[in-house]
Each structure stands twice: as C-alpha cells, then as structure tokens.
Design a protein with these regions (language model features):
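Glycine-rich portal/gate segments that line the openings of hydrophobic small-molecule binding cavities
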Residues: 37-79, 134
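Intrinsic-disorder/low-complexity, polar/charged segments enriched in Ser/Thr/Lys/Arg/Asp/Glu/Gln
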Residues: 2-6, 43-45, 58-60, 73, ...
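Beta-strand/loop substructures that line and gate deep hydrophobic ligand-binding cavities in soluble
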Residues: 80-127
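Hydrophobic/aromatic beta-strand elements that line small-molecule binding cavities or substrate pockets
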Residues: 5-7, 34, 60-67, 78, ...
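Hydrophobic ligand-binding cavity/cleft-lining segments
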Residues: 1-43, 47-51, 145
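Short strand-connecting beta-turns/loops that link adjacent beta-strands
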Residues: 12, 41, 70-71, 98-101
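Short, highly charged C-terminal tails/helix-capping segments
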Residues: 137-145
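Hydrophobic pocket/interface hotspot
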Residues: 16, 26, 65, 106, ...
Length: 145
C-alpha cells in the first residue's frame, strides 16, 4: 500500500534537515516509541508500542536512513515484528525551499504480514498516515520551541 504526505516547516532546509537527522528528536517524535538505539551509522534498533484498533501491540525492528543528500533528500526503511504481525516500509523523503519555509514530501510503501495484515488495507493506510502526521507535527513543534 502506498502512503504520502506533504509537510511545511517554518524554517530553512538546513534546520529541517538537522532535526530530521537527530536520533534524539526522531525517537521523541515517533508515536509510541519506547526505544531507539544506534546499531551503526544511520541504522537504529527501535521498539514501538502501538495502541490503535486491531494493530495494537509492541513491534521491534530496525530503521535505516540511506541515500542521503544533505538538506535535499534521503530514503528511510523500517521493518518490525510483533505479536500482531510484521510491518515493512520504505519512503523517499525530499526537502525543498519555498520562500521562507521548507516543504517536506514523503512518498512510500507499507507492507504488513500476519494478523495485522488482515485488518484491511484501508485501516492500515489510515493508521500509517496518522502516525506520519503526528511525527511531522511533533518535529514542527521542536523547531518552533
């Protein structure tokens, strides 16, 4: 299933890039993140507790940031497993200046297996988009505080 979002930040690309690359900020903004530990350069072990409808559960997995072009783009891949099943996702993230703001575009895919996949693509798509919206809203808050 495909997911996409566009987010506007009241900051220049360098500030937005720096916050997107900061593991402490990332972990504090991922909804339900209980752990986010470095495994090496741009690779992290994560544990999320998701409490939403039929996909409620704890997921453990990895997050990797790759193909980085400073202040312009990167690719994020994540995969995790938990009692409700497994989830794998990948997203292209791009930044572009527009006047005094920076626009971040996200285009990706999410795949699920096991019981979590049986809840239906619409529910999973909605939950994925909601978590992504919360993540970027948190980042915007970090930039303005």
């Amino acid at each position: 299933m495909e997911i996409a979002g566009t987010y506007t930040f009241n900051a220049p690309p360098d500030r937005v890039w720096n916050i997107l690359m900061d593991p402490q900020v990332i972990s504090s903004c991922i909804p339900g993140c209980e752990a986010f530990e470095p495994l090496g350069e741009d690779r992290y072990k994560a544990r999320l507790n998701v409490a939403l409808a039929a996909i409620t559960g704890t997921y453990e997995g990895t997050v990797v940031l790759a193909d980085k072009v400073s202040e312009k783009s990167y690719r994020l891949t994540a995969e995790g497993q938990g009692r409700p099943g497994s989830v794998k996702g990948s997203a292209a993230v791009s930044l572009r200046p527009e006047g005094d703001v920076t626009v971040v575009d996200v285009h990706g895919t999410v795949q699920a297996a096991g019981p979590v996949a049986r809840v239906g693509q619409r529910l999973l798509a909605g939950v994925s988009k909601m978590m992504m919206d919360r993540f970027f809203a948190c980042l915007q808050g970090k930039l303005t505080s």
